[in-house]
Design a protein with these regions (language model features):
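Short, surface-exposed loop/turn segments at beta-strand-coil junctions that are enriched for proline
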Residues: 23-29, 130
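Strand-loop-strand motifs at the edges of beta-sheets in extracellular beta-sandwich domains
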Residues: 6-25, 36
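Extended extracellular/luminal ectodomain segments enriched in beta-structured repeat modules
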Residues: 89-94
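Beta-strand signatures of extracellular beta-sandwich domains
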Residues: 2, 95-97, 166
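C-terminal edge beta-strand
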Residues: 44-55
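Short, solvent-exposed loop/turn segments at the edges of extracellular beta-sandwich modules
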Residues: 39-45, 146-147
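Glycine-rich strand-loop-strand elements at beta-sheet edges
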Residues: 70-72, 77-85, 99-169, 180-187, ...
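A short beta-strand micro-motif common to beta-rich folds, especially ectodomain repeats
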Residues: 29-42
Length: 204
């Protein structure tokens, strides 16, 4: 067996026994290679035309694969704070799991380091069977909120709001910051959306 006209896709080769082996090179768009194979045996010769199509694959993020319930999946994971770009060479149906940043915990004000509220969890959005067309998609990943981002006197040492995560025209909202505690008589700080409120410490 030998390829006598045309060529195999890049990265593939044919042995004299007719076996095609190798890993095809990545392509930016679906690519079809047409070639002619000639087989010779006992002074007889036969030819036949074949074609192989290499399908372009999406790119972006940290890529991994897994088989779940007998179905093979490819995962593209984007991390905070950089996010990234998801490149799709052709229309596909995908599943999207988007997690926003959690809110930061509140901070104590005063001598007693207790009573601060925990930050709220970041929002989670799940979209299955989501149809998207070819293109470049910007993915934003919300970071966790900072501690004591908002401060207005003793009573409000609240944690910062978690960042939103965005992509494919949907938004997962970041968690609210936890309320700060108070040890000086001004009262505990309230928590943001999903964040725990602060507590009053001491007798001042």
């Amino acid at each position: 067996f030998a390829v006598t006209s045309g060529s195999l896709p890049g990265g593939l080769s044919m042995s004299s026994a007719g076996a095609i082996t190798g890993t095809p090179n990545g392509v930016d768009s679906d690519t079809t290679s047409t070639f002619v194979v000639t087989a010779t045996a006992n002074s007889a010769t036969a030819t036949r035309s074949f074609s192989i199509t290499i399908t372009a694959q999406p790119s972006g993020g940290t890529i991994s694969t897994a088989t779940i319930g007998g179905t093979a999946y490819t995962f593209h994971k984007f991390d905070a704070p950089a996010g990234g770009t998801f490149s799709l060479p052709g229309s596909k149906t995908i599943d999207v799991v988007m997690v926003a940043g959690g809110g930061g915990g509140g901070e104590s004000w005063g001598d007693n380091d207790t009573g601060k509220g925990g930050g709220g969890a970041g929002g989670v959005l799940v979209r299955t069977g989501y149809s998207v067309t070819a293109g470049q998609y910007s993915i934003g990943v919300g970071a966790g909120g900072d501690s004591k981002q908002v401060s207005t006197g003793h009573s409000d040492h609240r944690g910062g709001q978690g960042g939103n995560s965005t992509g494919f025209s949907v938004v997962a909202v970041g968690g609210g910051g936890g309320g700060g505690s108070d040890n000086y008589g001004s009262g505990p700080g309230p928590g943001g959306s999903g964040g725990g409120g602060g507590a009053r410490n001491g007798n001042n």
